[in-house]
Amino acid sequence: MDQILLFFISSLALTLMPGPDILFVINQSLEDKKSGFLVVLGLCTGLVIHTLIIVFGVSSLIQQNYVIIDFFKYFGTLYLFYLAFIELKKNNKLNIKVKENFYLRGVYMNLINPKVLLFFIAYFPNFLFSNTIPISYQFFILGSIFIGQALVIFSSVSLASNKLILLIDVDLKSKKIVFLKSFIFIVIGLTILI
């Protein structure tokens, strides 16, 4: 049980550290509460998929094949650059309607970042807590704990971001905000690439 508590505490600390997921949640929560929450659900769905990949042992194949890792890294960066472009385009003077699915954005954001899977592969084995429970079950339990705390933290960040924007009464369609949101997508893309 000490291992599980240590895992929980370290997971909280890691999730709270400013990184691509937190930036993504903040950026998408500027739209409205619903958009932010859908992104959070999408990110956590991606975490479920990463956990299942580890539980079923596919992770070792992916870890040994750097072509797959590089593909996701470059595809992820291009996707985020695309989101930056869409952000600029939807707020231009032509007023082009862009259909957005914030849930899928969250799922894609999590799945295209190979660092998440590699992190799980490196992180989870350090917190195995039983000699009698199969490792795959332990990975599932650890993944569930990680997803649960991420859901709470990401949701809190989303709500706080949205409340802050409402409190300071910012025009989300102003050129400065649009460029800032696009810039954040580019920064997240570059972080995945590095």
Segment roles from a protein language model:
Residues D2-D70, A122-L142:
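Juxtamembrane transmembrane-helix termini in multi-pass membrane transport proteins
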Residues Q63-N92, I153, I165-I194:
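Selective transmembrane alpha-helices of multi-pass membrane proteins
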Residues L12, L16, I49, F85, ...:
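Hydrophobic/aromatic residues within the transmembrane alpha-helices of Major Facilitator Superfamily
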Residues Q138-K163:
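Hydrophobic alpha-helical transmembrane segments of multi-pass membrane transport proteins
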Residues T51-F56, I112-F124, I184-I194:
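Hydrophobic alpha-helical transmembrane segments in multi-pass integral membrane proteins
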Residues K89-F102:
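Flexible cytoplasmic inter-helical loops of multi-pass small-molecule transporters
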Residues G46, H50-V58, L80-L83, L117, ...:
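Alpha-helical transmembrane segments and their lipid-water interface positions
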